[in-house]
Amino acid sequence: MIIRTLDIGADKQAEYFQLEHEENPAMGYRAIRICLTQPEIFKTQLRALFRASAFGNIAIMYPMIISVEEIRKIKEIVEEVKSELREQGVQFSEVEQGIMIETPAAAVMSDVLAEEVDFFSIGTNDLTQYTLAIDRQNAKLDSFYDAHHPAILRMIQTVIDNGHSKGCWVGICGELGADTELTETFLKMGIDELSVSPTFVLPVRKLIRTSKCSD
């Protein structure tokens, strides 16, 4: 089971965590930026996740990453949490740690980022929005929004290649994960995992089973 740390802001709001109004929330104070500027909130999540790791196989995924420095800061906090748990005699297991690739910065730097983590999950919704400079919430721009844009597909291929070159497995989530027009393409690219909602499990699975690339 892969568990993502706090990922609110922009189109993801939570009643229990109020954020101030921002003119451009999609590029504002959200996701890992909240966790790194409010480390006690982050530590609370990490403590719970590592406690849970003693009872089952989990992995932790960090959203909205843009730099190696962020990952290294995350690792410092993770080590602090693990040290505190050891001192308290709390049992936990080592877990895989990965990141969301949902910004052009992360995609371009994916060869370097892959040296720091165990896996990538390509968040195609935000990656498309940021790459094409199109607000997904703006209906006036619907005709310009093209998730199949060659730039997006090239970026996905780059991330897959860079991840695999450093031993990271790579998955795809977001709307494109369930886009059956691209399932065959993703298999040819070498994708390791497609994350889809329950509604799309059967049609995507059928395509994978019948694909010549499924091996």
State each model region's role.
Residues 1-215:
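Conserved alpha/beta-domain cores
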